[in-house]
Amino acid sequence: MKLKKFLLTFNAFQFFFSLLLWVPIFYEYQKRVGLNDTEIFRIQSIYYLVFCLLEIPTGYLADWIGHRVCLILGSVSLIVANIWIPFNPSYSGFLIHFILIALSRSFVSGASSAYLYETLHQRNELDEYKEAEGKARAYSLLGKVICWALV
């Protein structure tokens, strides 16, 4: 794959992976299906705890099985989480949903930068890394700002 196509694909991944279009309305959805504030914020607390606890193991796993594989695993777990919740709108359903999202985000968090770095290193294009990483993060942020405003 040519460098330009690779960077376009990488930026698209960063843009779409971080969208999470449901975030601005999810609190209201949880309230409407019967969760109270204590339950909602307990789930959020567990999400952040699980995310932090999974950071090191998933980083190690990414180094062991490959960063690209972890990007795929992160994407699959995010898809499963978002398919899961409409069929399980309960406290335990939301808890599983957010644990899967924590797993997904921990798979991708360091693996995406490492994958970009490794790919550019293999192509002898490391001088492009800072700009490519910056653009990818900008596209991720741009997606959130524009799309969340529309939701």
Language-model features: locations:
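Membrane-helix interface residues
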Residues: 35, 64-66, 127
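Cytoplasmic helix-loop-helix junction between adjacent transmembrane helices
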Residues: 99-140
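Hydrophobic transmembrane alpha-helices of Major Facilitator Superfamily
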Residues: 19-21, 87, 91, 103-111
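C-terminal ends and interior cores of transmembrane alpha-helices
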Residues: 76-90, 94-95
